[in-house]
Amino acid sequence: MKKLSIITIFSMNSLDETTEKVLLIEIVGILEALESNAISLNEAENICFSPYIQKKLKEKKCNPEILEIVERGCELEDIKSLIPESYYKNIADLKNLGLALVGKYPFIHSSFWRE
């Protein structure tokens, strides 16, 4: 079985539904940590919300709805500096989009993290 994280996803040829669901769960976790100030925006960008990550996910034919969340996550720095009163609302909106999308994926039946 495969181990999954945002970094290991880049070594895959394509993304299946399980991989996309795990990616979404990671993204929602990053947004939750960002919203509660457990991580900085810079950390979130280093982990997930960068044009590089977006490009790699697009190359892997990632679900366009996930790509949209990542793209909007890349815009958080601009929002924080230009319209700071909207910053946390945008994080919450992205988190809610991610949660709604996670629910559309099928149940994960395998223990993919074990070898």
Could you describe each region identified by the protein language model?
Residues M1-E115:
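Acidic, Ser/Pro/Thr-rich low-complexity regulatory regions
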